[in-house]
Amino acid sequence: MAKTPSKKAAKAPKKAGSKRNKRVETYSSYIYKVLKQVHPDTGISKRGMSIMNSFINDIFERLAGEASRLARYNKRSTLSSREIQTAVRLMLPGELAKHAVSEGTKAVTKFTSN
């Protein structure tokens, strides 16, 4: 009995201007780093990471929307750290807002000093 050629279709050669798959950017590496700082012996599942990523995207969109609204109310065309800080104070409850503002201020100070 003769061996028959495989039935897999040959891939078409790539065109010069063919589109590449767009990379999906996530916060997973940052979530993992924070998790290891807080609980070094704890892991996270793919589904848990996906939920955390969605959560961060949601909070980011809400804060950006609120900051944008604040800038529009004050007839500003540029978002500054002040609008972001006010949006954080409006969106997050009590202690969480205080911690977020202090961490944000610390990050901005570190960024501008380098």
UniProtKB/Swiss-Prot annotation:
GO-annotated molecular function: DNA binding; protein heterodimerization activity; structural constituent of chromatin
Name of the protein in question: Histone H2B
PTM per Swiss-Prot/TrEMBL: Monoubiquitination of Lys-110 gives a specific tag for epigenetic transcriptional activation and is also prerequisite for histone H3 'Lys-4' and 'Lys-79' methylation.
Any single Gene Ontology cellular-component annotation: nucleus
CDD domains xrefs: HFD_H2B
Subcellular location: Nucleus; Chromosome
Species of the source: Olisthodiscus luteus (Marine phytoflagellate)
Primary location group: nucleus
UniProtKB keywords: Acetylation, Chromosome, DNA-binding, Isopeptide bond, Nucleosome core, Nucleus, Ubl conjugation
Functional summary from the UniProt entry: Core component of nucleosome. Nucleosomes wrap and compact DNA into chromatin, limiting DNA accessibility to the cellular machineries which require DNA as a template. Histones thereby play a central role in transcription regulation, DNA repair, DNA replication and chromosomal stability. DNA accessibility is regulated via a complex set of post-translational modifications of histones, also called histone code, and nucleosome remodeling.
